[in-house]
Each structure stands twice: as structure tokens, then as C-alpha cells.
């Protein structure tokens, strides 16, 4: 997925799923906490939505807080993720 498409996907998650009224656009230098007012609980929600909506696998052991400092660092992190594989649960 191209970077611009990832940015648009994150914007859609923030505005539609997380219902952040203060977010109208994203710039790579925007800080998630200070500029977009995303707290730690919302960061966890964002990770879940990245997996569900963007279909990227976010391994718990690879989540680095530095990846969630700015929009740009989040996009860098997302570019490194693998596509989420459909898990077939047939017991």
C-alpha cells in the first residue's frame, strides 16, 4: 500500500471509526498525542483498526512507542508491517 493511501486510511479511521472531531487532515509532522489529542487508550484502538480495516498485522512484540509519536512515524511503522493473513479457525 502506498504511503498516501495509508495516510488516507488512517484519516478515515480517525474521523469515522474513532470519531475524532478535531481531525480534518493529516500532516506527517503532526504529533498524535499533543496535536491530535490521541491518548494511550485511543492508540490501542488505532492499532486494532489498523489490523481490522487496513488489514495489516501488528505484532504485539514489535509495537514501539516511538512509532506512535507523529503521523509520519506511524506511516513508517505501517509501511514495515506485513498484510494480515486470514486465519482459518476450523476445530
Curated annotation (Swiss-Prot):
Modified positions (O-(pantetheine 4'-phosphoryl)serine) in chain numbering: 40
Keyword Phosphoprotein recorded: yes
Pathway(s) it belongs to: Siderophore biosynthesis; petrobactin biosynthesis
Location of the Carrier domain: 4-82
Phosphoprotein found in the keyword field: yes
Domain of life: Bacteria
PTM note: Activated by the transfer of a 4'-phosphopantetheine group from CoA to Ser-40.
InterPro entries: ACP-like_sf, PP-bd_ACP
Entry keyword set: Phosphopantetheine, Phosphoprotein
Record's function text: Involved in the biosynthesis of petrobactin, a catecholate siderophore that functions in both iron acquisition and virulence. Aryl-carrier protein that activates 3,4-dihydroxybenzoate (3,4-DHBA) prior to its incorporation into petrobactin.
Name by which UniProt lists this protein: Acyl carrier protein AsbD
Amino acid at each position: 500500500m502506498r504511503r498516501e493511501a495509508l495516510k488516507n486510511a488512517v484519516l478515515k479511521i480517525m474521523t469515522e471509526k474513532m470519531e475524532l472531531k478535531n481531525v480534518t487532515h493529516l500532516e506527517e509532522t503532526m504529533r498524535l498525542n499533543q496535536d491530535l489529542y490521541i491518548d494511550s487508550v485511543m492508540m490501542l484502538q488505532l492499532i486494532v483498526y489498523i489490523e481490522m480495516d487496513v488489514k495489516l498485522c501488528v505484532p504485539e512484540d514489535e509495537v514501539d512507542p516511538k512509532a506512535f509519536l507523529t503521523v509520519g512515524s506511524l506511516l513508517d511503522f505501517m509501511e514495515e508491517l506485513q498484510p494480515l493473513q486470514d486465519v482459518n479457525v476450523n476445530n
